């Protein structure tokens, strides 16, 4: 919810948010409605890319490294050329594993932010 709202407030025109947790989906929908963003943000329950139509310019996920590695092939298909995948929730020790999987799926690390043993990575899918 908070990532979808931030994307909307930063100018994204259409946002499809997905969370596996039913309560998180409920709360996200309420917060999005309260902030007047329902016309641009939809929230569904499911796995990361379940029900996302077409391709995206940006995909954002705050999940652990194992799941990021698992979904990278699907992200590669769902992300437009020159698109960006922002992945956070990665413990620093797993960053090399994520980078290896990213390269295997056609991504390049563009930026890495580290704080208190956690990492956020911006990956690019280039032409």
Regions found by a protein language model. Name each.
Residues 107-127:
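Core SAM-dependent methyltransferase catalytic element
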Residues 23-27, 67, 94:
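Conserved short alpha-helix immediately C-terminal to the canonical SAM/SAH-binding motif I
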Residues 11, 33-38, 77-81, 105-107:
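Short helix-capping segments at alpha-helix termini
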Residues 17, 60, 87:
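Conserved SAM-binding loop
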Residues 49-58, 73:
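A short acidic, Gly/Pro-enriched loop at the edge of an enzyme's catalytic core
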Residues 1-48, 52:
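Conserved SAM/SAH cofactor-binding pocket of Class I
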Residues 63, 87-92:
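Short strand-turn motif at the edge of the Rossmann-like AdoMet-binding core
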Residues 69-84, 99:
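A short glycine-rich, Lys/Arg-flanked "PGG" loop and its adjoining helix->strand segment in the class I
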């Amino acid at each position: 919810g908070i990532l979808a709202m931030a994307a909307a407030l930063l100018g994204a025109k259409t946002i499809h948010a997905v969370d596996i947790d039913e309560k998180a989906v409920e709360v996200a929908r309420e917060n999005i409605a309260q902030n007047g963003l329902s016309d641009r943000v939809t929230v569904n329950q499911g796995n990361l890319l379940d029900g996302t139509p077409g391709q995206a310019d940006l995909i954002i996920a705050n999940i652990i490294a194992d799941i990021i590695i698992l979904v990278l092939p699907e992200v590669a298909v769902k992300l437009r050329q020159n698109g960006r995948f922002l992945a956070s929730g990665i413990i620093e020790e797993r960053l090399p594993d994520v980078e290896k999987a990213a390269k295997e799926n056609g991504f390049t690390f563009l930026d890495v932010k580290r704080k208190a043993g956690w990492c956020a990575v911006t990956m690019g899918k280039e032409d």
